[in-house]
Structure formats: C-alpha cells, structure tokens
Amino acid sequence: NHFDLAIVDPPYGIGAGKRVGTTYKEGVLRNKKGFGNTKLYTAKNWDNEVPTAEYWNELFRVSKNQIVWGGNYFTQYLPESRGWIYWDKKIINHQIDNYSDGELAWTSFDTVLRKVTYDWIGLGYCNSSEKGTRIHPTHKPIFLYEWILQKYAKPNDLILDTHLGSGSSRIAAYKGGFN
C-alpha cells in the first residue's frame, strides 16, 4: 500500500485503436470541424485486451484506494462499490453516434455516486476552456483529474497512474501539489 490513490484508465478491450467508421478511416483519426485540434493516430493493438488478473492483484496490493476508468469493463476483477463516478461529456445533439454520452469510473470509496460534467468529445475539445491538441487517442481532460483529486485525494497523497496516456493525471497532480 505504498500509493494513497491509484487513478487508472487501462485498456477496455474494445479495440478502439482500430476503429473504422465515423471517427477512424483506415486506422487514422480524422479531424472534424468544430472538434478542436486532433493529432492523426495510426491504428494500434493497445486496446484489444483487458489487463490480466495479475495486474489487478498488483494494483490493489500497491495502492490504498483506487479509481478505475471504464470499471464497467472490468467487473470480474473489481469488488462491488456504490461510489462510482459518472462523467457526463455533454455531447450536444449526439454529434458523434459512436461515442458514449459519458464514462463510468469504479472507485474503492464507500460513498454515493458522483457526477462530473465537462464538455468533451473523444475527438477533442467541445466548448472547452482546455484548448490545445489532444495527444493520445483516449485523452481525458486535465479538469477531470483536477476534480477527482479535489474530491478523493488528501494533501500530500502519493498518486499512481499505471496507464499515463497523455499525462493529464500527472499535470493535474502537479498543479494540485500532489506527488
């Protein structure tokens, strides 16, 4: 239990890295008008499988509390919890049919379900103050991690992110004075 809080976003095993359709064309992400700046991504196999039981055992061994994005994909590895987080992306008029309206995060905290709302589309920023280029295919906004740290972490907590991705969690931790 070296880390006070693990905030992780492991691969969901849904093959997002090779999507073809509205957002991906032949394995390359297309920039769509109004969705902010997006980098082009080549199809990869990073999201074909979920982490093994060994990963989950180690995560629980090294951390006191956990927040797991996409927890709904890992129910076979996670204990029951009533303290889920629902991130409402405020997708207006469902502009992109193959993106969900929100995401779920399982938590180890014995608390009520919490909802955080932030304008966001997987392709980039939508009505967001967080301008810039998305640098990872499953990039989550810094604001989201700032909100999580304010609600679930204590000063001087040691934070773990096993799947750093774009580094949004690290930026939020740095800004909030967390290690």
Question: Positions of the model-derived regions?
Answer:
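Class I S-adenosyl-L-methionine
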Residues: 1-8, 12-44, 60-179
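A short glycine-rich, Lys/Arg-flanked "PGG" loop and its adjoining helix->strand segment in the class I
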Residues: 49-65
